[in-house]
């Protein structure tokens, strides 16, 4: 009898666990320093995490940011940070998610990573029949020409930090004090202004579910917060 070669056994791709930490309302700088520390000290055994937060009012300038795009900040502080991109605004009513993911473990590149975040946002908005789209060369998500979500990321040793900001139900006036993402007269909008819910929890739940679906994650909420102390 002729021998029949056995088919190779292919292990199924299992969903990967990721802890979700809801930080509540926080100043920007302590969270930024904490995710830097997390990324600098992690290794191949460190689990992935998603940090969810609302920030007190702040403008952040990315590595490509130009001071001339900060038009009239007034009382709102401006921070130069180490993410990609230009200038943006964070404030109450905006959902910010920092995916701290090992792209090597997920077996995806940076371009796919960005596309997956954008798709998660687009699918989240579809939950409320809001039609959103991405733009070539201008990362983020747009509705009818107005930006509703911004992306600013950093990848170090194959691991991501920084992330996305999603305008849910916020005062959009501070965006008029800058050229958002470096674009003069770029319009911005929010989920609430487009007929979606005002509640942060409802939007948060859908977005986290969509991010888990895009990246193949099993989310594990935890009440433990990262160390948010600033270095002396």
Curated annotation (Swiss-Prot):
Keyword Repeat listed: no
Active site positions, chain numbering: 181 (acyl-thioester intermediate)
Positions of the BPL/LPL catalytic domain: 44-219
Residue positions binding substrate: 83-90, 150-152, 163-165
An annotated GO BP: protein modification process
SUPFAM superfamilies in UniProt: Class II aaRS and biotin synthetases
Keyword Mitochondrion among record annotations: no
One GO CC term, this protein: cytoplasm
Reactions performed catalytically: octanoyl-[ACP] + L-lysyl-[protein] = N(6)-octanoyl-L-lysyl-[protein] + holo-[ACP] + H(+)
Recorded superkingdom: Bacteria
Keyword tags: Acyltransferase, Cytoplasm, Transferase
Functional description taken from the UniProt entry: Catalyzes the transfer of endogenously produced octanoic acid from octanoyl-acyl-carrier-protein onto the lipoyl domains of lipoate-dependent enzymes. Lipoyl-ACP can also act as a substrate although octanoyl-ACP is likely to be the physiological substrate.
Note: In the reaction, the free carboxyl group of octanoic acid is attached via an amide linkage to the epsilon-amino group of a specific lysine residue of lipoyl domains of lipoate-dependent enzymes.
NCBIfam families noted in UniProt: lipB (TIGR00214), PRK14342.1 (NF010922), PRK14345.1 (NF010925)
HAMAP family with a match to the protein in the record: LipB
Family statement drawn from the similarity comment of this UniProt entry: Belongs to the LipB family.
Name of the protein: Octanoyltransferase
Species, as recorded: Xanthomonas campestris pv. campestris (strain ATCC 33913 / DSM 3586 / NCPPB 528 / LMG 568 / P 25)
Gene that encodes the chain: lipB
């Amino acid at each position: 009898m002729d021998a029949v070669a056995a088919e190779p056994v292919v292990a199924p791709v299992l969903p990967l666990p990721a802890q979700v930490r809801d930080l509540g309302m926080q100043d920007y700088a302590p969270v930024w320093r904490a995710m830097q520390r997390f990324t600098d000290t992690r290794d191949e055994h460190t689990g992935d995490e998603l940090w969810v937060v609302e920030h007190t009012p702040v403008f952040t300038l990315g590595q490509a940011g130009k001071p001339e795009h900060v038009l009239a900040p007034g009382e709102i502080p401006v921070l130069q940070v180490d993410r990609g991109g230009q200038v943006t605004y964070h404030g109450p009513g905006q959902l910010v998610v920092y995916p701290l993911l090992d792209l090597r473990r997920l077996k995806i590149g940076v371009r796919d990573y960005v596309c997956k975040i954008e798709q998660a946002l687009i699918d989240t908005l579809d939950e409320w029949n809001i039609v959103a789209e991405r733009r070539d060369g201008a990362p983020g998500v747009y509705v009818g020409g107005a930006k509703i979500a911004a992306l600013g990321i950093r990848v170090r040793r194959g691991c991501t930090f920084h992330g996305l900001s999603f305008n849910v139900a916020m005062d959009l006036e501070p965006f008029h004090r800058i050229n958002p993402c470096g674009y003069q007269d770029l319009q911005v909008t929010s989920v609430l202004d487009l007929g979606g819910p005002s509640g942060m929890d409802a939007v948060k739940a859908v977005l986290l579910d969509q991010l888990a679906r895009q990246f193949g994650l099993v989310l594990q909420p935890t009440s433990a917060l990262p160390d948010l102390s600033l270095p002396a």
